[in-house]
Swiss-Prot record:
Region named G2: 60-64
Protein name, per record: Elongation factor Tu
Subunit annotation: Monomer.
Gene: tuf
Alphabetic keyword roster: Cytoplasm, Elongation factor, GTP-binding, Hydrolase, Magnesium, Metal-binding, Nucleotide-binding, Protein biosynthesis
Amino acid sequence: MAKESYKRDKPHVNIGTIGHVDHGKTTLTAAITSVLAKQGLAQQRDFGSIDKAPEERERGITISTAHVEYQTKKRHYAHIDCPGHADYIKNMITGAAQMDGAILVVAGTDGPMPQTREHILLARQVNVPALVVYLNKVDIADPELIELVELELRELLTEYNFPGDDIPIIKGSALKALDGDLEGEKSIMELMDAVDEFIPEPLRDIDKPFLMPVEDVFSISGRGTVGTGRIERGRIKINEEVEIVGIKPTRKSVVTGIEMFQKLLDEGQAGDNAGLLLRGVDKTELERGMVIAKPGTIKPHTKFKAEVYILRKEEGGRHTPFFNGYRPQFYFRTTDVTGSVTLPEGVEMVMPGDNLSVDVELIVPIAMDENLRFAIREGGRTVGAGSVTKIIE
């Protein structure tokens, strides 16, 4: 069967299910597709096909993730669900599946559990903009307990700087919805309405300020220096002023030509692989790892806080722990930069498989803002991944 072309008639939003093991994340994902399929807004996916998620590699890390798509009357959603707890941590830290919002699934029978807390914390650390809660298994939970669970959840969300009092908490049973029970199905529709309303529409990459990481540099005799790379966000037109940021002191230039596949363009935009001809820039002044950006929109930094995941030995990571002062390479966008790691107080060492917050100081400044993802490497081999949570200087 030929693939249908993707129609862009509705805003697109990326979401995912998060929460403690066995609280019903995958059942809920299957139930959403089943209920929306009856309205012609999704293809039904059964539990098994979501649960046996294929493995993918992102920044050298293997993650199992199921991708499901569906629509509501207002939006088109790409939804991710991960089989294992470690897959969630890796997914959120590597940004393999950038989430514009998430559905936190909590079993009414158990209430918040350790992974519930950990997923909320991670969602805060990696800046998932909004959460909606599905309180699952309410058909088999004590009604008084459910009220307590709701209060506890709102307090927990507030503790991690989410608007605990305002977040919609939808009560239902994903299993009943999946079995075609009307009450269950109603809770799924309520949930989708809450997701439509409460999770904000993301700013598209093309609407953000222009930024292109430099991958390669050429000089064209008599014309100047060309930086090539894939435009990460925004758009650029000929004769616009740009800044070259990172590694060396920031300097300004003007784009005098934009080339793509040997053709000259008036404008380049997010997603394009382009070459930018820069006025008055010598070939020695531009190098891989710098970025070309709209002036004033990004600055170079050397010190930051990050949330990191360290690969297990079985994932191709280190076989031994590391200690305070560890000096690997940090791979940002297109280049490796050496940096030293300071562990949090009270943490003596980090074992393969751990995730934690660390402070990093790089030997040269790199253009960065909060949420920038990076890989941690040793001699070209990926041993971890991270996300910048706070810039220090």
